[in-house]
From Swiss-Prot:
It comes from the Eukaryota. GO terms for biological process: DNA replication initiation; regulation of DNA replication. This is Origin recognition complex subunit 3. It holds the Pfam family ORC_WH_C. The modification Phosphoserine is found at S23, S516. Belongs to the ORC3 family. GO terms for molecular function: DNA replication origin binding. It is found in: Nucleus; Chromosome. It comes from Bos taurus (Bovine). Keywords: Chromosome, DNA replication, DNA-binding, Nucleus, Phosphoprotein, Ubl conjugation. GO terms for cellular component: chromatin; DNA replication preinitiation complex; nuclear origin of replication recognition complex; nuclear pre-replicative complex.
Length: 712
């Protein structure tokens, strides 16, 4: 490239062609590394199938949980808009007309879930109320100019089902638009008045329900908006409400009190506010766990420690359902990647079919499972030899064990729900108020060995008859829905208890009537009264016999205790539970509970750990000469004391970099090369300062102070 010219000029050089980076498909990771096996592709396909089923189930749950909230909002918007235009014809309602219909939507502190909820709300409003739905964020609206600009730009993009000619006439070039409420009102009137009344019904959208559909403005994070911007917009909009029918929806994360904190009375009086409350985050989490984990619909399960990590992140960090589901997806992916026998984590008929085609290596993997080894130790010597030597016999036994595991889960979740019916309303909630708390305790150990369970049994022995019958009724409905033989007998046993409680009422009434008749025949003189009192006192002091109700209540408690001890065994006691349960809590904690200090030191000290480039592999204590500049500067600064001489640091950096670059001495002059290396060094030092490893010092101008810890 020649840059010689007679006159001064600017020379443009096209950059060298760079190959486009090829993204590696995720399924390729299953075929590499130490966990690769002959069925890696099948494991990945199974993972995708289960995750798609879980994802569709969570989306369906989200729609069901938000349905009541969205229906109430749609009804409010329709009522507000119809009342608005009805009053607009009556000029005596001018004051009422200036009140903007406002929905205060309290979404909770789980801010990361707000986007998904408001996105779904936008779709519902566009399908049922109006096509003009706009969502604004505080970061995009620092002042009134940008607020109106974003509002106008999104309104221009809203699609109205009108004829193509009308579309062309309505379109306005945004560069020529003067952003004001007058121009916005004029644009709105021009759009709404050009709808063709003779348009076929099939071509009409929800906007044709009214002559002028409202404009719904959603403020996603109201707490973050500037107070002056909100006040000015509300005051201006109230003056143009008869021309521009606006409805506001405030997305609130904290409390409705924030409206009165941000807006003075003169401004808040211009709003007709109605409060709407979304579902609690904890209730949402309980529903997700109930539909995804506490069911036999999905074979994948979590161990106690893994579930505890996910719930702790949810409860003590962000209250985000979306992040919880992402953690569940990560657990599912890690299970299918790290466990070769996860190929059996599918529905029971498919798992039995796959067992027949297991290879010799997979059979050996089954024999290595700790739970299977414990199972083999309990068998007879002949069966032990067959399980350890015959693959055919092993496959038959594996099919039987997986079927038993499926039956175990079916009974486990039914009895778990039954126990929750008895414990969820007890004082102080010894086993937790939510079923997820009870589930974690049952996963951890044999729950009947805990002190909390003993206190539950004591409290159950103090329940009144009405409370006990209500709990039995709920359990009867649960067991009646089961098709299992043993649990079917359990339902009959509960039905017998209910019948016995019912018979107690009848016998008690008969006894009361007979006693009242006998008392009527007895003499009521002082002698007989004293005699009867002495007899009652002696009877109470000599023996305290249990009533029929107390005996029956004790039988019910013993029955529940026997169910718990029989069916709520911990999952790790079941053979082959490793195929379905993900228990690598340490791996999940590394991915989700990031330790920035450790991760940063590892990345700078050993870049091969993350980049996986063989050229970066080096012995401990050595500096790879092809490492990134910041890594070289970081490892050099580790060798220095509290104060680092920039000149010495720069020379050491240049020495390492020069050894790495095998450049032709004639291609670039020595001075230019030194300038390039010096610039790279300055950039590396600036990056280290930005990360907080060093800082300038006033003690010596050519030195920097080291801020890092110890010798790392």
């Amino acid at each position: 490239m020649a840059t010689s010219s007679v006159s001064k000029g600017c020379f443009v050089f096209k950059p060298n062609f760079k190959k486009r980076k090829i993204s590696v498909p995720i399924e390729d990771y299953f075929n590499k590394g130490k966990n690769a096996s002959e069925d890696s592709k099948l494991r990945f396909e199974t993972y995708q199938l289960i995750w798609q089923q879980m994802k569709s189930e969570t989306e369906r749950l989200q729609e069901e949980l938000n349905k009541n909230l969205f229906d109430s909002l749609v009804e409010f918007l329709q009522t507000s808009h119809s009342g608005l235009w009805k009053n607009s014809k009556d000029w005596s309602c001018e004051i009422k007309l200036r009140e903007i219909p406002t929905a205060a939507l309290v979404l909770g502190v789980n801010v990361t879930d707000h986007d998904l909820t408001l996105r779904s709300l936008t779709e519902v409003l566009q399908n049922n109320v109006t096509p003009y739905v706009v969502s604004l964020q505080a970061k995009d609206c620092p002042d009134m100019k940008h607020f109106l600009q974003k509002l106008v730009s999104q309104l221009m993009d809203c699609k109205v089902d009108v004829q193509s000619k009308e579309k062309e006439s309505v379109q306005v070039i945004q560069k020529n638009v003067h952003y004001s409420m007058d121009s916005l009102s004029a644009w709105y009137m021009s759009v709404t008045q050009k709808t063709d009344p003779k348009m076929p019904r099939k071509k009409r959208t929800s906007s044709s329900q009214w002559q002028s559909p409202p404009v719904v403005l959603i403020l996603k994070d109201m707490e973050s908006f500037t107070t002056k911007v909100l006040q000015d917009f509300i005051i201006i909009s109230s003056q143009h409400l008869h021309e521009f029918p606006l409805i506001l929806i405030f997305g609130i994360a904290t409390s409705p009190v924030v409206i009165h904190r941000l807006l003075p009375h003169a401004v808040s009086s211009l709003l007709c506010i109605e409060l709407f409350q979304s579902l609690s985050c904890k209730e949402h989490l309980t529903t997700v766990l109930d539909k995804l984990l506490l069911t036999t619909q999905f074979p994948f399960k979590l161990s106690e420690k893994v579930l505890q990590i996910l719930t702790n992140i949810f409860l003590y960090h962000d209250f985000s359902i979306q992040n919880f589901i992402k953690g569940l997806q990560l657990s599912l992916l890690e299970h299918f990647y790290s466990q070769p026998l996860s190929v059996l984590c599918c529905n029971l008929p498919e798992a039995k079919r796959r067992i027949r085609f297991l290879s010799a290596n997979q059979c050996e993997n089954i024999r290595r499972l700790p739970s299977f080894r414990r199972y083999v130790e309990k068998q007879s010597s002949e069966k032990q030899v067959a399980l350890l030597t015959s693959d055919k016999f092993l496959k038959e036994e594996t099919q039987s064990l997986l079927e038993n595991l499926h039956v175990y889960h079916k009974n486990y979740f039914l009895v778990l729900r039954c126990l929750h019916q008895f414990t969820s309303s007890l004082p102080k909630y010894p086993l937790g108020r939510q079923i997820r708390e009870l589930y974690c305790m049952c996963l951890e150990k044999s729950i009947w060995d805990s002190e909390e369970y003993a206190s539950v049994l004591q409290l159950l022995r103090l329940l009144a008859k009405d409370e006990l019958m209500a709990m039995l009724q709920n359990c009867f409905k649960l067991f009646q829905s089961s098709s299992g033989k043993e649990l079917g007998n359990t339902a009959k046993r509960i039905e017998e208890f209910l019948a016995q409680f019912q018979s107690l009422d009848e016998t008690k009434e008969e006894e009361d009537t007979s006693q009242s008749q006998s008392k009527g025949l007895q003499k009521t003189d002082l002698y007989h009264l004293q005699k009867s009192l002495l007899e009652m006192k002696e009877l109470r002091s000599t023996s305290k016999r249990q009533t029929k109700f107390e005996v029956l209540r004790e039988q019910v408690v013993s029955f529940v205790d026997s169910l718990v001890r029989e069916y709520l065994l911990p999952p790790d006691t079941q053979p082959l539970h490793e195929t379905l349960y993900f228990s690598s809590a340490h791996t999940l904690r590394q991915h989700l509970n990031a330790a920035p200090r450790i991760a940063l030191h590892t990345a700078l000290n050993n870049p091969y750990y993350y980049l996986k480039n063989e050229a970066l592999r080096s012995e401990e204590g050595c500096i790879p000469n092809v490492a990134p500049d910041i890594c070289i500067a970081y490892k050099l600064h580790l060798e220095c004391s509290r104060l680092i001489n920039l000149v010495d640091w720069s020379e050491a950096f240049a020495t390492v970099v020069t050894a790495a670059e095998k450049m032709d001495a004639n291609s670039v002059t020595s001075g230019e090369r030194n300038e390039i290396i010096h610039a790279r060094f300055i950039r590396a030092v600036s990056e280290l300062e930005l990360l907080g490893f060093i800082k300038p010092t006033k003690q010596k101008t050519d030195h920097v102070a080291r801020l890092t810890w110890g010798g790392c």
